[in-house]
Amino acid sequence: MNEGAITNAILIAGPTASGKSALAIRMAHETGGFIVNTDSMQVYDVLDLLTARPNKADLAAAEHHLYGHVAPSMSYSTGRWLDDVADLLTQPAMKHRTPIFVGGTGLYFRALLGGLSQMPEVPGDVRAYWRGRMEMDGPENLHRLLSERDPEMAATLQPFDSQRIVRALEVFEGTGKSLLVWQQTKGQALVDDHSARKIVLLPDRTWLSERIARRFALMWDNGAIDEVKALLVLDLDPALPAMKAIGVREITAFLQGSMSREEAIERSVIATRQYAKRQSTWFRNQLDDSWCTHANSDDAFAQLTTTK
């Protein structure tokens, strides 16, 4: 057992639209517990619909935390999320209650169980500098520069892997240490891996595909366009995570007249299906045998309520 780690947690992972949120609410009723967002996009304010955050009825049905608490103008790291979770779990009102972590971000679950390196926060000006250098000089030139400064890290990266090259350079400059050093420093588990009840929902692909299409059509009809309008008014950097939420680019193109309603919906649905496929692949390949896989939430609920 990890010293100080929560021993009564429930973890519910799965791709978008798989029925995780409804299952979490059922478990909150069953246990008297509270729900904790474990999805990197649902932390952002403004995009209630497009990130499929719990609606008013859901929020009234169970206690939810860490949803929509981050401004879309901010970048929000896994480390920041973990700090927020730690603060939440130490609140007196949360003691002796069951935390139910639900979401689709695999790295959040890994961090929760202590399997993610404690990555440093890099100053914004350092990040901006190296992203600017990448645009000007290209990945091969920066890979050569990384080879001079941090040859061991450079040896692990392909010369065309721009994102990881920039990350390695900014970490080296911002902290004075190689990214390899940080990657070898594992985090402290907040949830005990051995005692937690862990479920991953992996529905039938056809069922999930159809559900994604229906859900996005409802998003469109119920206010997704207004959400994107509100986001665009903020005049944010397109590179910010909130601006990359599925549907933002497509609805923006629709508002600008460069894409029809039908095409915007179709492209958003396709992008969501591709995202769900990537999530499913990650969960299949990265989660160990201690996670119980179910195709539907009813079977998962039955298992969770019979396994204490």
From Swiss-Prot:
Chain positions of site Interaction with substrate tRNA: 105, 127
Region (Interaction with substrate tRNA): 39-42, 163-167
Quaternary structure (record): Monomer.
Function: Catalyzes the transfer of a dimethylallyl group onto the adenine at position 37 in tRNAs that read codons beginning with uridine, leading to the formation of N6-(dimethylallyl)adenosine (i(6)A).
Keywords, sorted A to Z: ATP-binding, Magnesium, Nucleotide-binding, Transferase, tRNA processing
Name of this protein: tRNA dimethylallyltransferase
This protein's encoding gene: miaA
EC identifiers of the protein: 2.5.1.75
HAMAP family: IPP_trans
GO BP: tRNA modification
Matches recorded under Gene3D superfamilies: 1.10.20.140, P-loop containing nucleotide triphosphate hydrolases (3.40.50.300)
Amino acids binding substrate: 16-21
Cofactors named for this entry: Mg(2+)
Protein's organism: Brucella anthropi (strain ATCC 49188 / DSM 6882 / CCUG 24695 / JCM 21032 / LMG 3331 / NBRC 15819 / NCTC 12168 / Alc 37)
